[in-house]
Amino acid sequence: MVELPDLLTDLFRRHRGRTALRTAGRTWTYEELDRVTSALARRIDAECPAGRRVLVAGEHTAEAVVWALAAMRSHAVHTPMNPGLPADRFEEFARVADAALLVCFEREALVRGEKAGLRALYAGDVGWPTDPAPAPADGTADEPARSRVAYSIFTSGSTGDPKLVDVGHGGLLNLCRSLRRLLDITPDDQVLHFASLSFDASVSEILGTLYAGATLVVPVRDQASWLGSVSRHLAAHGCDLAMLSPSVYARLDEAARSRIRKVEFCGEALGEGEYDKAARYSRVFNAYGPTEATVCFSLAELTSYTPSIGTPVDGFRAYVRDPDSGDHATAGTGELVIVGDGVALGYAGGSPAENEVFGTVDGSPAYATGDVVSLSDDGELTYLGRIDEQIKRLGHRVNLAHVGSTLSRHLGREVALVRQDATILLVTAADGEATEESLMARIRDLVPVWEAPDRLVLVDALPLTSGGKVDRSALRELLASPAGAPHGGTDGEDAAELRRVLDVVTAVLGQEIGPETSIFDAGGSSLAMIQIQVKLSDAYGEEAVEAAFAAMDYDFAPAAFLRHLRGEAVAPAESAVDTLLRRVETERDALRAELPLLRRDTRHEPVPGAADGDREVLLTGASGFIGGHVLDRLLAAGRPVLVVSTGDPDGVLTGHATRFGRQAADYARVRAISYAELERWVDRRRGPVVDAVVHCGYQVNHLLPLDSHLSGSVRNTALVVRAAAALGARSFAFLSAASAGADFLPLSAATLTAVGDPYSRSKLISEEYVNTLAVLGCAVSHYRPGLVYGHRPEDRHHLKDDWFTALLETARRVGAMPRLSGHVPVCDVGTLADTLLGRPDANPGTADGASRTPDSRSAVVVHRTYALDELLRHTGLTEADVLAPAAWFERVRDGGEVPAPLLAAMQAALSGPGWPSAHREVDHDILGRLLGTPPDTPAGDRPERTGTTAEAQNGAAHAPTPR
């Protein structure tokens, strides 16, 4: 039996010089993948004990594919996981996996990993896979034994709960051979990588391609949705083979479908309509295979439509089980039982009842699928359906009864899930309080998108049978009648109007969504939301559309948009801002009540290596641009520092030393811990004495939904506040953002409403939590800086996602600048770092904070501003090169070189009014130094200083909110 790591090693070396992996602007040969994945596998082995699971939480990038291959080659067990799972679901999956390591590609996942008790490795900290960080090696250690599990992968199973399938090595070679032979994959083929790594179809894509010596091509996500990006890629470049579900294929543009030479349908039953569309352009294959059968069990090439799912691939046999006798037959109709070495080893941690589907037939491993098939005498299979209520949506198995039970429990109301053709309706009784919108919002928080209903229907009462159960037959009749139509339903002109809105959404997302479906649940982004808003403004007017979007709190769903547009939005429903405020006030009050108890009950421990009475400065965000400079100044001052990090604590200090050219001895008085460790200190009421807190750690992303900020950076801020109370901090400096507003006002619905984007709202909420420290006499300061620069060469990687420098570079490249209103406020990182440290460094030996009068140095911080003419000079452009923003973005978008998230960030930033007046507080040209352009105007020609940071303290401000 060939094991997966050995199979990959053989393939890499067999096809050495050929191209194995390609994405825009980057290719890897098989030889390069051999070297890179081997090095990364060693890194995984250094972090994860042999035989334990490593969760790889990434998708749709070449980098994620490289790490997945590294995990397959390691001594750990590769276990891919969807990075977009709801937070509770993420923790549940991590618990089921009992993993020892999480590899992630977004920093938000680090927080989730720590919350789930996982050791986390951020791929960006390791380095781009072509130059991986060296892993420690122990030449005296024996090579650990390989696990009998080749990989583990999640499936929801027939219960709807996550099940982790352990797949052995036995069926992998047969899978590769069968795919190459039956799909006619040649070394010259370009194979599309579409599936998320968390779907086992990705195993077929990756291993089938590598076995044949072909090239796996990963499209760049340059559209609002992954599907839209893939459709655009296919229209431009085509592919030789795509493995897609019928529902995905149906949503591809005609231009994309016409460029696919071969298409293998999988994941769902293939209908005649999809076959006819595909057969116009492509060779068509139909595949079938549960996760428990090493991806693919049967495969057929279709030359005319038939529901056949083919014959078993190499190494498998098919039987049908008679439901009455339990006998297994080689022909007939019944439950399909798969037999062969490719049958999975079982469900990890599954109960005996769950694992009853695994057994043996004639001494060989067998799996009872729960699928009803017809098996002909010559071995051809026809899929007929499920033997239970389970259906398949978006590649996941979903049991409607289980989902209904889950939602009934969490919503506190009786619900019924009903199928109407391909649409899933959730039906519940109207009670005069909950609305369709509020219920759908809660449902989206409770279950992943593939379990969420397409529509929600409120009825007067759920019909019951004589036995007291919901009468689904009567319910379907009720829904079919005019009286039972969904509340807010449309017909005639209303239906036509809804159709127009849906068409706009389809044009932007590249796929059709349900009327009540949020575009974010459908994979859309903030950029997509902006594009939809612009298109709808052309039809309905800018003010009306803006009001409707604001009323929806920018969580756009087509039918909800029309209700708000017509003034039909449910009046009794609490507004999104009011709901948010109530939630924040509840958590703030609980925090305020807890802080004195934490201060009273925490036992303080001596700081290792510190003199008596020497207190540490607690610093977050040391791996970030600003926080790194703050740490460098603390080191220069000789202060003891406690660094709290979302990443690997030791890696933060190593990275800082490299970035600032420091030696290990410089960090003798520095300790680094994780947020999870800090939380343990707080919860057990024991820890060191802290003098001051400087909180710089925050994920800067104006496009993330507010819930992501609340569960990530805001949650971390609340933890740091609790730690400040427990560890006796006498001052707390919080690095906020100028986009949170110019005035330091009490938090209210009005102040939240005045701040447009979720990131800035989250900063206001974090400030409110920090303010609770006033009950302890802790001096709190919030600093709201403009755009912060002063990057040295070692800091340049921090500019990767910076919208403003990206805008300037794009302006240089396209030879045009968008017309900006007002000025751009900028800060110097060195001056800002000194400001943040003004309090902890001023007098570290002052009296205990409890006896101090609480004060604040809160300020909006701007060191100088830049007007349009200055930006033109820095980019080498003139007034003649200035375009209206809409025209400029159209030119840039057509060029296709700016990543969609950066483009969306630019658009969001330029939608604001800008800084109203010129301001200069530093003598040097911050942007000139950054961009390497000549010095600016002589001192005599400069505008007068119009204010200083100090003037904004205690509520004064320079100007309205900047971009």
From Swiss-Prot:
Modified residues annotated as O-(pantetheine 4'-phosphoryl)serine in this record: S526
GO molecular function: ATP binding; ligase activity; phosphopantetheine binding
Transmembrane portions of the chain: none
A biological-process GO annotation: antibiotic biosynthetic process
Co-factor: note: Binds 1 phosphopantetheine covalently.
Pathway(s): Antibiotic biosynthesis
Disulfide-bonded cysteines: none
Region Disordered, residue ranges: 928-963
Record-annotated Carrier domain positions: 492-568
EC number: 6.2.1.-
GO cellular component: cytosol
Catalytic activity line of the entry: 4-amino-L-phenylalanine + holo-[peptidyl-carrier protein] + ATP = 4-amino-L-phenylalanyl-[peptidyl-carrier protein] + AMP + diphosphate
Record bears the keyword ATP-binding: yes
Loss of function: phenotype: Disruption mutant does not produce chloramphenicol. Mutant does not accumulate 4-amino-L-phenylalanine.
Entries under Pfam families matching the protein: AMP-binding (PF00501), Epimerase (PF01370), PP-binding (PF00550)
Entries under Gene3D superfamilies matching the protein: 3.30.300.30, ACP-like, N-terminal domain of ligase-like, NAD(P)-binding Rossmann-like Domain
Domain description: Contains an N-terminal adenylation domain, an internal peptidyl carrier domain and a C-terminal domain that is homologous to nicotinamide-dependent dehydrogenases.
NCBIfam families: AA-adenyl-dom (TIGR01733)
Physiological role: Involved in chloramphenicol biosynthesis. Activates 4-amino-L-phenylalanine by adenylation and loads it onto its peptidyl carrier domain, via a thioester linkage to the phosphopanthetheine moiety. Can also adenylate tyrosine and phenylalanine at low rates, but not L-p-nitrophenylalanine or threo-phenylserine.
Record's protein name: Non-ribosomal peptide synthetase CmlP
Organism annotation: Streptomyces venezuelae (strain ATCC 10712 / CBS 650.69 / DSM 40230 / JCM 4526 / NBRC 13096 / PD 04745)
Name of the encoding gene: cmlP
